[in-house]
Regions:
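N-terminal active-site segment of His-dependent metallophosphoesterases
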Residues: 1-45
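Active-site neighborhood of phospho(di)ester-bond hydrolases with catalytic His/Asp-centered motifs
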Residues: 6-7, 31-36, 53-58, 91-93, ...
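Active-site environment of divalent metal-dependent phosphoester hydrolases
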Residues: 10-14, 38-41, 59-65, 96-101, ...
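Short acidic, glycine/proline-enriched helix-loop-strand junctions
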Residues: 43-53, 127-130
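Helix-adjacent hinge/juxtasegments
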Residues: 51-94
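Binuclear metal-dependent phosphoesterase catalytic core
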Residues: 77-85, 107-108, 124, 129-162
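Internal catalytic-core helix/loop-beta-alpha segment
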Residues: 79-119
Length: 162
């Protein structure tokens, strides 16, 4: 099973559409958005040929966002615990770094997916992979928008600059 991971798209429809096109080309089965979609209009592009899950980011205050996402996917509020292909996956935006660390260090999850920092991360702590796909570029960060694809069968993680 292939899992697409995206975060911090902040209403940039061009980036959202590029991410969706990439995920479809890679034939991912599920896409997880780690928060900061922001407005409902930019969520609708994720209504595509994959299952979709999203958590709330610190900029996701638009009250219609849940309704729009729920029309084609699942909106999990601040945290999601998913089981995909036998893998236990925690999804949290990452606003509180201490909570991210606790999720990783607990050893209860195969993957901890997060966003917020707009910086790509893939780290392994015991049996847990901590993954941040990055996000729209911010000052001092990489200049490219990235997404990630995880092969849940092999554990391989790849990043793609869009």
């Amino acid at each position: 099973m292939k899992l697409g991971v995206v975060s911090d798209t902040h209403d940039n429809l061009d980036s959202v559409e590029a991410a969706v096109a990439y995920f479809e080309a890679e034939a991912v089965d599920v896409v997880v958005h780690c928060g900061d979609i922001v407005a409902p209009f930019s969520a609708t592009a994720f209504d595509a040929d994959f299952d979709f899950h999203a958590v709330r980011g610190n900029n996701d205050g638009e009250w219609k966002l849940r309704e729009i996402v729920e029309s084609f996917g699942t909106y999990h509020d601040d945290f999601a615990h998913l089981t995909l292909a036998g893998e236990e996956i925690a999804v949290y935006h990452g606003t509180e770094a201490g909570l991210v660390d606790a999720l990783v260090e607990a050893g209860s999850y195969d993957y901890v997916l997060r966003g917020h920092t707009h910086e790509r991360v893939v780290e392994h702590d015991g049996e847990t992979t901590h993954l941040n796909p990055g996000g729209l570029p911010i000052a001092g960060a990489d200049d490219d928008f990235h997404v990630a694809v995880v092969d849940l069968g092999t554990g391989d993680v790849s990043f793609e600059a869009l």
